[in-house]
Each structure stands twice: as C-alpha cells, then as structure tokens.
C-alpha cells in the first residue's frame, strides 16, 4: 500500500494550491518542502492579482482554492485596475504584507485534513514500469504515492546572477534542486532554460517620501474571495517616482557588466516584466521609467521598488538607484539579481498537467514556463485536482478556454508551448466577455461542487447567493413597460411600441436597478451585490448571445478526440513536416491540432475526414 495518494514537491504558490486541492478531494496528501517556515513565501513582488492575473485568483477561489482568501487576509492596498473600462477587463489587485501572507498561507495548510507536511530535499523520483510512484529524499527517506506533483519554481538548477557573480540557489539563501533536473532529463523530457529577475530591496526609513508621488488604495476595497465579508487590514499608500537621464547614463555606461548583456545568462526573460537594463536598451528614447515604491508590510520598513529589476553589479545598482528622486540617500538592504532555472517544455503535458510519457507525474508553475504567483497557483490547483482524480482512478478533468482563464492558460501552454515566460493577460482570452472576474463563482463553483473540491461553507453560501440571483433575474424579466409608460418615469426608450422587461432596460447606458426602483418598488428586495451582478449580465446579454455560437463551435472541436496512436505517416496529403510535428506533439483533439504551428485548414479537413471514416468503420464492425 502506498504511503500517500498524492505527493506534492514544493511549498510555493503552485505547491500550496496543489496540495490543498488534492486533499480537498479526499486524497491522502504529502507536501514536501525544504523548510516549513518558507511555505507561502512571496519570492518576488509583494502583490497578488492585476490584469488577467486577478481573473485567475478569482477562479482559484471559485474552486475553493487558497490564494484569494490568503490575499484578502494579507492585503494592504486593494485597487481595482481598469475600473473605468468594462467589467470584462477589470483586474482586482492588492499589495500584500509579506509576513501576513506567509502566516495566513501556513495557517491554511496546517488546517487542511488529509494533508501532511515533510521537510527535506526531494532529489529523485521513484518509478515502476515507466510509471512515477514516489519520491526519494536526499537524507535517504522515500515516500510512495499514486501521483506526484512537481512545483519546483525557480529551484531546478537555479543560478543567481549579480554582475559577474554566480551563486547556485533557488532563491537568495536557499539551495537549488539539481537532482530533480537530472531526473527529468533522464526521463527524456525536453528541458529549457528561463530567467527572471528581482530589484534591490530598500530601507524605507532612508527614502525621502516628500520627493515622491503617492498612490492610494481604493476607498472601498474589493476582496478577491467570495468568502471574505470585509477587508480588515489598515490600507496604505505606495510611492511613485521615475528614473532620470542620470540613471539611464549610468546603466548604459555599465551595460556590459550586466549578467544579461555580458552573455553570462542563457535563459530567456519575461517580455512583459523587463529588467531596467532591457528598458534602457529597448526604450532608451523615453525620458523616464515609472517606479512604484511598495512597502513590504505594515510593520516592515523594507520597500520593493517595482520597475527596476536588474542583474547589474552591486556598485552599479548603488549608483543608479541614488539618481532616482527620493532615493538619493537610500540604504540598499539586498541587491537585485537575475535567476536562471530549468523548465520543461509544456507541450510534454496533457491538459490535466500530467506528463504524457511519464504517467503519475504532474507539473505546475514555473517548471512549465510560466511567470507569476497567480499563474502558478492556478496550475497547482489543476495539477492537484487531477493527481487526486488519478489516485482515485477517476477520469481527469480538463478546463476549456471557453469556460475559464485557467483553461486559456493551459491550452496555450500545452498546445503552443512557450518562447519566453508565459504571463496571463485578458487579451489572451477570446471569450473574455464571458470570462469576467465578477462571474468566476457562477462559472466555476458548480464545476467544483461536481468534482467534490468545494467545502460545505462555500457550498452553502454559493447556493444562497445563486438563489438570490435567480430570484432577482426572474423578477427583472417579469416586469415590463411600454415606451410611453417608461417615459413618465424618465426612461428614454425607443418609441416603437414594444414592451421591454426591466432586465432588457438594464442593457441601456446609465441604467441601474436603483434607478428603476421608482417604477418598480419591488426591486428593493434585490441585495446590492446581487444587483451589481445582474446589471453587468444585462449589459452583456446581447454580446453573450452572439458569442454563444462561437463557444459551441470551439467545444465541438474540443470534443472531437484524436486517438493517441493516430498514424499521421499513413495520412496522404499531409506534408512530411506536418506529419513530424503532429506525431511529436500528439494533439488530443481538433482544437489542439489547429494550434500546432503550420497546420492549415486543409490539414484539419484531412484529419477530420479520416476520423469520420474510422468512426463509420468501427460502427459497421460493431453492428
């Protein structure tokens, strides 16, 4: 008998969500981490959410994951980004107190049934007949399980760079994981090298706050979690300053000393989170680059200068930072650095995040080529759920790009692979009008209930809210008015004699349930939060109807399965190049096949014709 059903290696954002999701499904789960004290550490910026990323956090929360609740417990500056734009692209974000975040995550992990935590260095995986079945520790211990989830972050052969200095590390002060990299290479998985970076940490007591701008929190904080009633932490401002011509000159004069530009780093960095060296080289004509001075905690004087990630030597960092307004006398507590690490080509994965050629092994987070806490957490949840499903001999669950940003991300990764660290944006989702942050619970909590990963507290609250929403929508659709009747109450409707329901009227600009209450006093019964959801759904109703046909088409493509043993070589009409690419990537369905580089509509037609012919043949044989 196995020691556990699921083993999760790594206690970062992906690992915590994976372990929690697995345990919520009832799997006996072991979380292996170097040190229990580092569970939930925010390795880079002290913030959760943002554009696209905030959607992922809401989706994690809708499935009863941890990140939203923990962010609410630790948030010290909540802001809803893109507030003036449509609800589809608004992004909830908070700066977080690092200490509060880590403590809240550790409390969550400690409170979960079926979840044990072990300290140590997992350096190898156990296999039997090509199936992963456990983990081997550096100290000689071993643990067996039906499924293993790797969430190693930047630890796989991690190498820190500060100028020409190199230090093997997963992050500052922690040893890298070398053994697991060798294990994955031994399995024949295609590995690559990526890079990310972080800025220096500053002593806030030595910043001249009078010389920098201020950015405050929203007056009414919007929580991440459906389960959060109110934000209780004191909310704070962050500072805003800019680089100067003097800053740019120092960096340009020393660019050859940067680890990135000296040829020392082979890994590719994130395009959308460039280092200050990249900004100067690529956007040298700008008169300055904005920097946000983000306090790392309510009782912590450390400040994170968001916008000046660097791998320059310490003396250059010290010089250029002091040319920035407000930072002339600043004390640097820790230099900025770049870190290189190994990752696996995500095209090696099934949409379950299971490794195709190594059954029993699942990967989540930066090991799959992504960047960001939110992307990692979302993958961890998916890998943890599917690892537990496999252990219970249940079918895997695949998220679709038509139902979630999680599905968009996983489809992008497993179908297209990556050329640089992958970051989520709302622009990546074709159906973003449907996949809003505000409706994540309505979209995904029913999925979580069906899977069995939603706890009783959320289940009860969700059912109550859904009942209130449905009652409110039924009421709005039962009330109607003619243009002339509406005119008496100040409603500007088309004078076409058509009756319109209250729900239809809400699709008009500047209409609200509050504004309709003089006409229909019974609308007082609709609670404020339910009214806000109904108003958004009414505004998007026409567009959602148009989008529905497109979604059905994509779902049809996703449901047209391609057998794993499909013989592309025997398919006439396909070029040799396409045969090789398709045979290598093994798309599971037509939707994935369409995303393979170079695949044409004609090639899809050939595959579809073959599938239909085989289907008819099997029916004849079966008949």
UniProtKB/Swiss-Prot annotation:
Pfam families: GIDA, GIDA_C_1st, SAM_GIDA_C. SMART domains: GIDA_assoc_3. SUPFAM superfamilies: FAD/NAD(P)-binding domain. GO terms for cellular component: cytosol. Its cofactor is FAD. Keywords: Cytoplasm, FAD, Flavoprotein, NAD, tRNA processing. It is found in: Cytoplasm. Transmembrane segments: none annotated. Its main location: cytoplasm. NAD(+) binds at residues 269-283. One of its GO terms (molecular function) is flavin adenine dinucleotide binding. FAD binds at residues 10-15. InterPro entries: FAD/NAD-bd_sf, GIDA_C_N, MnmG, MnmG-rel, MnmG-rel_CS, MnmG_C, MnmG_C_subdom, MnmG_C_subdom_sf. GO terms for biological process: tRNA methylation; tRNA wobble uridine modification. Belongs to the MnmG family. NCBIfam families: mnmG_gidA. NAD-binding protein involved in the addition of a carboxymethylaminomethyl (cmnm) group at the wobble position (U34) of certain tRNAs, forming tRNA-cmnm(5)s(2)U34. Homodimer. Heterotetramer of two MnmE and two MnmG subunits. This is tRNA uridine 5-carboxymethylaminomethyl modification enzyme MnmG.
């Amino acid at each position: 008998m196995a020691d556990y059903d699921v083993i999760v290696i790594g206690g970062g954002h992906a690992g915590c969500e994976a372990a929690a999701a697995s345990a919520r499904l009832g799997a006996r789960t072991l979380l292996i981490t170097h040190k229990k004290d580092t569970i939930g550490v925010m390795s880079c910026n002290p913030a959760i959410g943002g554009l696209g990323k905030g959607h992922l956090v809401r989706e994690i929360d809708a499935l009863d994951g941890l990140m939203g609740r923990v962010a609410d417990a630790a948030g010290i500056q909540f802001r809803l980004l893109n507030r003036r734009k449509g609800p589809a692209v608004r992004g909830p974000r908070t700066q977080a107190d690092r200490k509060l975040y880590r403590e809240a995550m550790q409390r969550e992990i400690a409170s979960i049934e079926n979840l044990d935590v072990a300290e140590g260095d997992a350096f190898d995986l156990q296999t039997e007949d090509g199936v992963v079945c456990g983990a081997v520790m550096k100290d000689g211990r071993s643990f067996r399980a039906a499924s293993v989830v790797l969430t190693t972050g930047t630890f796989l052969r991690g190498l820190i760079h500060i100028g020409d200095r190199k230090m093997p590390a997963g992050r500052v002060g922690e040893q890298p994981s070398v053994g697991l990299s060798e294990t994955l290479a031994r399995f024949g998985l295609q590995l690559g090298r990526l890079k990310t970076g972080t800025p220096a940490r500053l002593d806030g007591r030595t910043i001249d706050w009078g010389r920098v701008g201020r950015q405050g929190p929203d007056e009414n904080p919007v929580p991440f979690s459906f389960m959060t009633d109110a934000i209780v932490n004191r909310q704070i401002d962050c500072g805003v300053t800019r680089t100067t011509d003097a800053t740019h000159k120092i960096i340009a004069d020393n660019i050859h000393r940067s680890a990135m530009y000296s040829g020392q780093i082979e890994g590719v960095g994130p395009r959308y989170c460039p280092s200050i060296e990249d900004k100067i080289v690529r956007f040298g004509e700008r008169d300055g680059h904005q920097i946000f001075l983000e306090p790392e905690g309510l009782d912590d004087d450390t400040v994170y200068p968001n916008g000046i990630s660097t791998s320059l030597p310490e003396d250059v960092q010290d010089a250029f930072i002091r040319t920035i307004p407000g930072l002339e006398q600043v004390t640097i507590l820790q230099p900025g650095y770049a870190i290189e690490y190994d990752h696996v080509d995500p095209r090696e994965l099934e949409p379950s995040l299971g490794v195709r050629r190594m059954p029993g092994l699942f990967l989540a987070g930066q090991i799959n080529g992504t960047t960001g806490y939110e992307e990692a957490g979302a993958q961890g949840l998916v890998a943890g759920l599917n690892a537990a499903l496999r252990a219970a001999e249940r079918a895997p669950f695949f998220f679709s790009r038509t139902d979630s940003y999680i599905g968009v991300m996983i489809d992008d990764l497993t179908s297209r692979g990556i050329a640089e660290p992958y970051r989520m944006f709302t622009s990546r989702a074709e159906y973003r009008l449907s996949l809003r942050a505000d409706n994540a619970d309505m979209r995904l909590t029913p999925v979580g209930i069906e899977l069995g990963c939603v706890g009783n507290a959320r289940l009860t609250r969700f059912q109550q809210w859904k009942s209130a929403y449905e009652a409110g929508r039924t009421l709005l659709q039962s009330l109607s008015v003619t243009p002339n009747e509406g005119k008496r109450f100040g409603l500007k409707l088309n004078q076409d004699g058509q009756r319109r329901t209250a729900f239809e009227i809400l699709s008009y600009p500047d209409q609200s349930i509050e504004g309709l209450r003089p006409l229909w006093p019974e609308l007082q019964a609709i609670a404020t939060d339910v009214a806000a959801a109904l108003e958004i759904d009414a505004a998007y109703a026409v567009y959602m109807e148009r989008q529905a046909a497109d979604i059905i088409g994509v779902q049809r493509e996703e449901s047209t399965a391609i057998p794993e043993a499909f013989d592309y070589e025997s398919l006439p009409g396909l070029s040799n190049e396409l045969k090789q690419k398709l045979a290598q990537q093994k798309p599971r369905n037509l939707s994935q096949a369409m995303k393979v580089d170079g695949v044409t509509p004609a090639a899809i037609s050939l595959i579809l014709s073959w599938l239909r012919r085989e289907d008819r043949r099997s029916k004849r044989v079966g008949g």
